[in-house]
Design a protein with these regions (language model features):
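RNase H-like nuclease fold core
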Residues: 3-57, 68-76
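RNase H catalytic domain
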Residues: 20-26, 64-136, 142
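Short, low-complexity, polar/charged sequence segments that are solvent-exposed and flexible
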Residues: 33-36, 52-54, 98-100, 139-143
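Short, conserved alpha-helix that lines the donor NDP-sugar binding/gating region
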Residues: 59, 63
């Protein structure tokens, strides 16, 4: 590993995630995730359709895939930003997970979170998550 690579792994990374669907309760859904250094250099991104899913399932799937992307690069410190207040509040323990299908996804996300040395997740307004939202829209358009 280069000295620069080692330095990056010691620092924290930024992960913006988003999930969405075509508007029906179980419409075509897609996820987007953007992994960057703290200097906003893009390291990796995800833009893919995930099949029929609710908006909240897509949001959780985006978080899970983004965390897997970071762990696959041996990243230890991460700051996550997403525009789903529900997912952010549930991951932070502010709100209970009341739906069984979300509970399973919450458990997967929690297990991934535990693998980081430091983790923080914060809600951001949609306009501050535009790049991740764009990745979702790209994936949805690709399937049209």
């Amino acid at each position: 590993m280069t000295e620069q690579g080692a330095d990056l792994k010691r620092g924290y990374y930024l992960l913006n995630t988003d999930g969405g669907n075509s508007g029906d309760p179980l419409g075509r859904a897609a996820i987007g995730a953007l992994l960057r250094t703290r200097r906003l250099v893009t390291v990796a991104q995800i833009s893919k359709a995930i099949g029929p899913a609710t908006h909240n399932v897509a949001e959780y799937q985006a978080l899970i895939e983004g965390l897997k992307l970071a762990r696959g690069r041996e990243i230890q410190h991460i700051r996550v930003y997403m525009d789903s207040e529900l997912v952010v509040d549930q991951v932070n323990g502010v709100s209970a997970v009341r739906q069984a299908h979300l509970s399973e996804l919450h458990d997967v996300a929690s297990n991934l979170v535990a693998q980081f040395v430091s983790f923080r997740i914060s809600w951001v307004p949609r306009e501050m998550n535009a790049e991740a939202d764009g990745l979702v829209n790209d994936a949805l358009r690709a399937r049209d």
